[in-house]
Amino acid sequence: MDLSIRNLPTKFSLNTIRNVTEFYANRLMGNKLANHVSVRLVFAKGLRKTTGCFAWCTWEDDNHRPREFTIMMDARMGEKMLLTTLAHEMIHVKQYAKGELKDMLSAPSISRFRGKLYDFNNLDYMKLPWEKEAHNNEFQLYEELKEYLKK
């Protein structure tokens, strides 16, 4: 995986964040797909305060099975929150890269998830199926990371 990290808070090790991101990518997408994905991880102070979000993920190249992504993350999170949030956002990278999630360019508020269209202006955030999947699996992925790091 091609990974660039910007504005990493000094309380975190560059190697740790790199290894964690690569672990999540390989675990979610397998080595073959993960090796063809590029992620730009950007930390921003006050992101949650200005946007209401701890983090978000967006594709940068093409909405049909994209390979280039940016993940924006609030720089003021603690370690567990950051690693769990990164797991959540990497699940979205997997959803986009595998073609499970696709933003509809002709209708910006509509996304297709596993073949079904959803207007996210008319649904609560937690009822969006791609968010349900990310929320339901982020902690398990984080726990798998902790087990992996014990080895």
Each model region followed by its residue ranges:
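Histidine-centered divalent metal-coordination motifs
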Residues: 88, 92
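Long, well-structured alpha-helical subdomains associated
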Residues: 120-151
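Hydrophobic or amphipathic, alpha-helical segments that drive membrane association/targeting
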Residues: 1-12, 39-49
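Post-HEXXH active-site segment of zinc metalloproteases
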Residues: 80, 84, 96-130
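Surface-exposed helix-capping loop/turn segments at secondary-structure junctions
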Residues: 28-35, 100-102, 145-151
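Active-site scaffold of zinc-dependent metalloenzymes
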Residues: 46-80, 93-97, 101
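Hydrophobic beta-strand residues in large extracellular and virion-surface proteins
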Residues: 17, 37-41, 69-71
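Zn2+-dependent metallopeptidase catalytic core
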Residues: 12-36
